[in-house]
Amino acid sequence: MSIRILPQEEIQQAASSFHNPPLLYANPKNLYARRAKRLRQLAEHNPFGDYLEFVANIVEVQLDLLENQPIANRVGELTAYLEAHQGVKPLDVKTFKRSDEWQKLLLAFIDKFKPYASDTVLATLEWLEKASNSELEMLADHLLNECYEEVGADKAVFLWAVLSLYWVQLTQQLPRNTKAEYGEERHTCPVCNSAPIASVVHFGETQGLRYLHCSLCESEWNMVRAKCSNCEQTGKLDYWSLDSMDAAVKAESCGDCESYLKVMYQDKDPHVEPIADDLGTLFLDAEMEQKGLARSAINPFLFQVE
């Protein structure tokens, strides 16, 4: 999938199909507030509760920076780029030129997160604080290109939190007279080309529709429920849960590509949230791994480093 700007004559036609939009941008303030609340709720009765509380602290710092240290306005630049490059992923992690604002956000994040940090975490924060600009850019490149072993899980969590905060603000500056174009690579985000965290089956205006939730820019894009979100095959899909088939979080597995992705059902629990509920169902991941299935998603708080 990719994005193109609609000419004026197509805007009215597109408006008639907004009940089934192929692409949804996040509301960052609402998203971070909901995520932090859900993490703390799940932490109360979860064996990994301490880690969920740790992640909730990260999310609340993201919200603080969103409200008090927003990035510069690049609307004109982004609109001009889309007009000149129709049918692209406008914030593609492999080609988009980051400004140094993300590094400024990182330093602000470190300063605000230190009161929550243990000695071990504090050592990581201080390393990042002292790193040169070129070192940080290299680490960001490795991280965004999925070379996690070049970064380390301890640093990756904080770097991704800040890069995601930077990217989600960029999505707010993209022109809204755009349309997601179906094409190749539907398993990655049409905005930034990152992998999903999970898929969410919506209720409300988009009742019953499945959207993949981006791990970086927090956008969601529609994919039909009858096919694998990774390889798009349809013949060997199975659904797994820890408790019952009415569970709000299940794993969708594909026998063709031997991968799985979690599916979250808002009609079963309206409070499900991709990152929080993914972290809250780690035992489901363990079950899938025992079946020899590979996770096709990225959770920025669970980087797998070989």
Curated annotation (Swiss-Prot):
Location relative to the cell: Cytoplasm
The record's PANTHER family line, in alphabetical order, gives: PROTEIN FDHE
What UniProt keywords apply to this chain's record, in alphabetical order? Answer: Cytoplasm
NCBIfam families in alphabetical order: FdhE, PRK03564.1
InterPro entries registered for this protein in UniProt: FdhE-like_sf (IPR024064), FdhE_C (IPR056796), FdhE_central (IPR056797), FdhE_N (IPR056774), Formate_DH_accessory (IPR006452)
Described function: Necessary for formate dehydrogenase activity.
Instruction: Give Gene Ontology CC terms.
Output: cytosol
* Gene Ontology BP, a term: protein maturation
Please state what the protein is called: Protein FdhE homolog
For this chain, the family text in UniProt reads: Belongs to the FdhE family.
HAMAP family the UniProt entry points to: FdeH
Q: What is a GO molecular function of this protein?
A: ferric iron binding
Pfam families the record matches: FdhE_C, FdhE_central, FdhE_N
